[in-house]
Amino acid sequence: MMNKKWWHNKVAYQIYPKSFKDTNGDGIGDIPGIISKLDYLKDLGVDILWISPMYQSPMVDNGYDISDYYAIDPMFGSMDEMKQLIKEAKKRNMYILMDLVVNHCSSEHEWFQKAMADPEGEYGSYFYIKDGKDGQPPTNWRSYFGGSVWEKIPGYDNKFYLHSFAKEQPDLNWENEIVREKIYEMICWWMDQGLSGFRIDAIMNIKKDLTWSDLKPDGPDGLADVYKLSLIHISEPTRLDVI
């Protein structure tokens, strides 16, 4: 019999911060706007607020390309305002969840910048960097956003990095224990700030086919959708270890 968790039988409400409530007139929703609506949301019967990404980001994919997991993007407010939101929610017996986007980061993240400067160095192992096939991508996988999942590394004729989504969203290498530990540290840090938990984004994509085998093409571009690999590997023990 499954033990009852605190979130069972709770009402959750997703907030997309950009379009929720603007308090400073710049046309972009912000953290003070969320705070201002807590009483209203409580009156509606909401217990849990799941907030889409507000981390620092170049916003190539609406915040799902994170350049700093420890910072709030200035368009939404400050870290002090985030802490105030958590505090005000707790006063009302409400819980704050944030999106946890760790299948990939932003190409502007410090780790990736260091990886591009030295693909064979320590930070290169934080990502999936592979040699191509005579200058062509290592596999025929298609990204969720179209085109190859592989992008050639500037300055190299035959080295590529993998991105399941946009090229500005390089996939993190979950086979690397150091990467896992750094992400776990980040999760613990946010919990220490008072966050109640996370909604995990794109979790089905973190396990890769390490044989790097081509798939049967499913379109005229000669590529095959990368999500098919996620369906194949969705139950593998290493994926469950991460969760």
Predicted regions and their residues:
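Intrinsic low-complexity/disordered segments
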Residues: V11, S230-H233
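Single conserved hydrophobic/aromatic residue that forms the stacking wall/gate
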Residues: I232-I243
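Active-site-proximal loop/short-helix segments
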Residues: W111-K114, R199-L229
